[in-house]
Structures are given as structure tokens and as C-alpha cells.
Amino acid sequence: MDKKVSFTSSVAHSTPPYLSTSISWGLPTKSNGVTESLSLKVVDARPERLINTKNISFQDQDSSSTLSSAQSSNDVTSSGDDNPSRQISFLAHSDVCKGFEETQRKRFAIKSGSSTAGIADIHSSPSKANFSFHYADPHFGGLMPAAYLPQATIWNPQMTRVPLPFDLIENEPVFVNAKQFHAIMRRRQQRAKLEAQNKLIKARKPYLHESRHVHALKRPRGSGGRFLNTKKLQESTDPKQDMPIQQQHATGNMSRFVLYQLQNSNDCDCSTTSRSDITSASDSVNLFGHSEFLISDCPSQTNPTMYVHGQSNDMHGGRNTHHFSVHI
């Protein structure tokens, strides 16, 4: 005999949400004449869908109680007229319902300890089991509370730390230069031979003497920590380097003119300037630019002073040409 099972759902979206489900069943004996019922209540746990509920009722009844099931289904449909709902009715064979009842009875019989006592407890006091379904709904974007989210355990590889062995440094290979390998092995063999003969090994000299260390601390260092060159440091502090090059040559030329004036002061009898004097004066002219000097000669009766104007120009093919005008 077929049994009619009605399924009523008031879900607005097709995507299965997070569900909180409770199942209660009562399995009375057939002698009492009470209908066997199995109800499954599915509650939508979303905040905006807490008002809407899902009721799934499975009723197992005889042909005489078909009218009452039809009335109950009509009541559920009338109560859900305000919200859009869908109602699905299908037929289930009696063998499937009987198999479900037998599996539930066996489970409770194992928990109680004896099969007869477990079946009696089921008939006397109907039990209730609660469980929840976790569905990954991507449409909410993580707005669900933490209680409804699946608790996934993530193992970080940095969280687990393994202690290192104590003899790790001793067993590790030492990488040395290929050219120094033979000398290192020779010294180690010689040291091992002396230790086997119980001979005293001389104390090794320190890597750096203390005086050298103190001297290194006193030496000036640059920004990168390297030692500065003292010669370059002295050249940078030399005051002559601060003067421009033309000014240095001008001071040298002035000293030459003073020497020429002293030489001419010894000859007091001269009244005119010879050609050789003019030539010597031309050598002392500044070769790097235009200059004008005043030279005082020895006093004479006709010309008490002598003016020498010198001009040099090195722009003509790299040769030095001199132009002088002597006023007596």
C-alpha cells in the first residue's frame, strides 16, 4: 500500500542557505491505532530570512486517514498565502518508510544497550535530535555570524618549530678556499700528531696586535667606514688650493717685477731703457690674461718715471705674442 508524503517549502531563493534542522519522530505501536508521523523542520538561519521557515511533514497513515492529511496540507498552504511558497507532493512506497523506521530503531537500540529496552524507550518517550547543515553560500559575502560558518583548521608551517640537534655545527662541512686547502690539512695533521705525543703547543698569536687595533681606531674613516687617505686629506686642507689659478700666477708675476725693479735700481746712470730691459720685462708679463703694471725706474734728469704697459694674448694659434708701449 502506498503512503502519501507531502513536502511544503517557503523558500524565495533557489540557493540552499545555512540550515538549522530539528527532527522529531514518534513511533507508537500499531495496536493503539495512532498514526505514525515523522516531521522534519528546517529553519533558515540567515538574518533576513529568520521570519520564513521551512516545514517538511511526512505522514504515514492508512487509507482511512487520507482525508485528515489533505486537510492538514490545505491548512499549511492557506497559512503561507502571504509569502510565495512552493508545494510539492509525491508518493513514497511503504518499503522505503519501513526501512527508515528500522534503521532508526536499530540506532537507538545500540545506544540503550539492549535491543528490547531501546525499542521500548522509543515507544514510551519520543526522542528529538538536532543537527545543522552547513552550505557554502557565496551570495552573502561573509555576512553570516561566526557560529554558522564552518570551522576549518589551517596549519601554518611556521607554527611548528623543531629543535635543532646539538651536534649540527660539528658535523657540518667547512668550505675553504681551494688554494688554502692543502695548507690547512697539513697544519691539522701536524697539530694532531703533537697532541698524540703530549707535547706542548705554543699559544697562537692573536689575529691583530693591540697596538694596531688602537692605531686603526685613531685613523680617520669615511662615511662607509673605510680609512681615508692622509695625503688627499692634507691636499684638501692646503690654503693654496683654495686660491684660483689666475691669482696664483699673478702673484708670481708680481714677484718677478719686483726683482726687475731691484736690478734696475743699481744702474742709476741710465736715462733710457734699453731693448734688453724691455725684453726682460716682456717675459714677466702675465701669460694668462691682460695685465697692466707700473714700474718706477731710477730717477733721471729728463724722465723721473717710466711707465711700461704690457699685454699678452695666447689666442693666436697657441703662440705667445707680446705688445708693449714704453712712455719716456
From Swiss-Prot:
Record's subcellular location: Nucleus
Native organism taxonomy: Eukaryota, Viridiplantae, Streptophyta, Embryophyta, Tracheophyta
Spans annotated as Disordered: 54-86
PANTHER family: TRANSCRIPTION FACTOR NF-Y ALPHA-RELATED
Organism: Arabidopsis thaliana (Mouse-ear cress)
Transmembrane segments: none
InterPro entries for the chain: CCAAT-binding_factor_CS, NFYA
Coiled coil (UniProt feature): none
Gene giving rise to this polypeptide: NFYA8
Residue positions of motif Subunit association domain (SAD): 175-198
Gene Ontology CC: CCAAT-binding factor complex
Keyword set, alphabetical order: Activator, DNA-binding, Nucleus, Transcription, Transcription regulation
Tissue localization of expression: Expressed in the whole plant, except roots.
GO terms for MF: DNA binding; DNA-binding transcription factor activity
UniProt-listed PROSITE patterns: NFYA_HAP2_1 (PS00686), NFYA_HAP2_2 (PS51152)
Binding region for DNA: 205-230
Protein name: Nuclear transcription factor Y subunit A-8
Bias-annotated ranges (Low complexity): 57-75
Cited function: Stimulates the transcription of various genes by recognizing and binding to a CCAAT motif in promoters.
Biased composition (Polar residues): 76-86
Claim: Protein biosynthesis is one of the keywords in the record: no
Subunit structure: Heterotrimeric transcription factor composed of three components, NF-YA, NF-YB and NF-YC. NF-YB and NF-YC must interact and dimerize for NF-YA association and DNA binding.
One Pfam family of this chain: CBFB_NFYA
